[in-house]
């Protein structure tokens, strides 16, 4: 039992579990020598002693990381507000009443419904006392006085007095039932349907009088108890191998009383993965050997501690799997930098990653290598349970260097956005806001060009009555230049002695040319609305890659004012990307915004 257990970095999901396991054990386990990080061999070593009271460390980690953002944490924050309110004896107004009522609703809902499953675990009479106090709490109204508020606050504080009573197990470990009830929602982002998240099965057992214990015991029974037995087990007759750690496992049998079957664990609880007990037609010769050891099973239970979760279960894990130090440092750096105001600021994510890699590159601490960014978004319902759907981006060496080379222009899009306006009130609908830095980076990571983003940005600028935005024509020109470089990177078009690529100067020349064309066109037509019609027709031709239509519209419009088209448009006939780049540059110039300095440049034909 004293021999250390070794686990190597593997696939992204197991790596997320390993990182979660390290996070849960914390620096104390490293300092004591019970947990060792071996970067050279990409593995960790840990003593079985770390499993003592592991269930408490497990939940304490989540409480520390997310507690303040969840219901019980917010109720405790409200208690601070109550104390300050009493001290300051604030005067009442409608705004204060509405703010307090929101908190009152939260408190009543939590203690009358959400936390009811906890009450049977507490001292006799606890539930009756809490529900009696909760029933007395009423929302405030216009006639409410300071005295009414203080009476309400006294009731809330009385509830919290009950809840904050310390409860310990026989070993002196503190139990945090209310926090755990909230934390279950975070853990559910990573896995579902077993242990303390198998709500229906636990309820049935309790109804039958079976003592399943509290959440701590349920976790230990599910994930730790079998490890202790497995480590003591004589494995000489075991013939199967764990698909992850390659450790020995017993062969599966149809005998339900086989005591060794408890060591055969599956990972179906993590999501839409293969269920070994069903669909044996999916495996060779109808014989399933896809099992993991109890130790690996425990690591997979730590997956939610490896991800960084924000609002509505949006999660992030960076699978920088060169070594454990890099994996741990990069993910924890991202957490501390983007987890602010109780929400993950997604717009900051990639900027932080690139900055960290740039610093590492400068310090020559790590060789730059491909890394995988794993994200969770919506959920998938399977047999009444909700599992995460994962999305993957690869940050290759090629992409990372491209980002470093273009960091100045890319960073100029940070905090740039567009948002649609409400049709009736003309107020921005901020839940629809698109942040350009994130959109641009993700498009590049998916190895796509940026034409659709450029097109959308042009449409936004052309539709002032529908959108609000904070970018201009110069930003669009920068994006066209980034796009040219990105396309040449993707297609390997950089050739010594080959045709010279379009430059930012070419793009700016066309934009400026369009700016002066616009002025002359409006002067000739005496109707500014005509330019809008021209913008939409040109955009349509660009969207459909119709060079002939675009050139017909362009030549006709120039002929109308007696002006020749710019000589650079000859290149539009030879190359689709140059056509779209020059076409959008001209469209941007027609938008009549951006920095007007040096607009004389490019006015020549």
Where do the language-model regions lie?
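Domain-exit/linker segments immediately C-terminal to small folded modules
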Residues: 260-448, 453
């Amino acid at each position: 039992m004293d021999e250390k257990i070794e686990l190597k970095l593997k696939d992204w999901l197991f790596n997320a579990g390993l990182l979660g396991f390290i996070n849960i054990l914390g620096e104390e386990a490293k300092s004591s020598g019970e947990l060792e990080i071996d970067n050279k061999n990409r593995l960790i070593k840990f003593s079985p002693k770390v499993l003592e009271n592991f269930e408490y460390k497990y939940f304490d980690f989540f409480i520390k990381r997310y507690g303040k953002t969840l219901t019980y944490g917010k109720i405790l924050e409200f208690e601070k507000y109550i104390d300050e309110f009493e001290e300051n004896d604030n005067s009442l107004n409608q705004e204060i009443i509405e703010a307090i009522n929101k908190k009152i609703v939260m408190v009543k809902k939590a203690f009358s419904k959400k936390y009811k499953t906890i009450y049977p675990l507490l001292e006799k009479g606890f539930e009756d006392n809490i529900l009696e106090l909760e029933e007395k709490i009423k929302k405030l109204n216009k006639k409410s006085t300071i005295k009414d508020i203080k009476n309400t606050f006294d009731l809330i504080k009385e509830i919290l007095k009950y809840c904050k009573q310390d409860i310990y197990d026989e070993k002196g470990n503190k139990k945090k039932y209310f926090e755990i009830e909230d934390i279950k929602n975070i853990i559910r982002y990573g896995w579902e349907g077993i242990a303390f998240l198998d709500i229906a099965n636990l309820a049935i057992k309790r109804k039958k009088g079976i003592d399943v214990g509290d959440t701590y015991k349920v976790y230990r029974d599910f994930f730790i108890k079998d490890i202790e037995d497995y480590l003591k087990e004589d494995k000489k007759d075991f013939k199967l191998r764990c698909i992850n750690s390659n450790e020995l496992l017993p062969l599966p049998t149809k005998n339900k009383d086989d005591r060794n079957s408890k060591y055969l664990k599956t990972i179906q609880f993590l999501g839409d993965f293969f269920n070994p007990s069903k669909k044996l037609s999916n495996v060779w010769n109808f014989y399933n050997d896809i099992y993991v050891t109890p130790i690996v099973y425990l690591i997979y239970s730590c997956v939610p501690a490896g991800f960084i979760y924000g609002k509505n279960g949006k999660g992030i894990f960076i699978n920088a799997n060169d070594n454990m130090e890099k994996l741990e440092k990069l993910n924890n750096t991202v957490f501390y930098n983007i987890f602010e105001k109780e929400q993950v600021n997604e717009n900051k994510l990639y900027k932080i990653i690139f900055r960290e890699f740039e610093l590492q590159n400068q310090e020559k601490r790590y060789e730059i290598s491909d890394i995988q960014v794993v994200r969770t978004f919506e959920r998938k319902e399977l047999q009444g349970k909700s599992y995460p759907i994962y999305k993957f981006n690869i940050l290759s060496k090629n992409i990372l260097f491209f980002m470093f080379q273009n960091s100045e222009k890319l960073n100029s899009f940070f905090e740039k956005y567009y948002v649609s306006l409400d049709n009736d009130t003309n107020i921005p609908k901020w839940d629809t806001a698109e942040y350009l830095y994130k959109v641009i980076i993700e498009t590049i990571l998916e190895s796509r060009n940026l034409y659709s983003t450029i097109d959308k940005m042009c449409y936004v600028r052309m539709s002032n009555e529908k959108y609000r935005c904070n970018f201009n024509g110069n930003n669009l020109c920068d994006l066209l230049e980034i796009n040219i470089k990105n396309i040449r990177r993707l297609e390997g078009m950089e050739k010594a002695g080959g045709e010279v690529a379009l430059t930012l100067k070419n793009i700016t020349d066309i934009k400026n040319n369009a700016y002066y064309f616009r002025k002359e066109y409006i002067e000739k037509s005496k109707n500014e609305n005509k330019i809008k019609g021209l913008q939409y027709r040109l955009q349509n031709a660009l969207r459909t890659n119709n060079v002939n239509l675009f050139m017909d519209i362009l030549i006709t419009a120039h002929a109308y004012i007696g002006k020749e088209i710019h000589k650079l448009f000859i290149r539009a006939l030879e190359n689709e990307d140059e056509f779209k780049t020059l076409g959008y540059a001209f469209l941007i110039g027609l938008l009549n915004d951006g920095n007007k300095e040096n607009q004389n440049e490019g006015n020549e034909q």
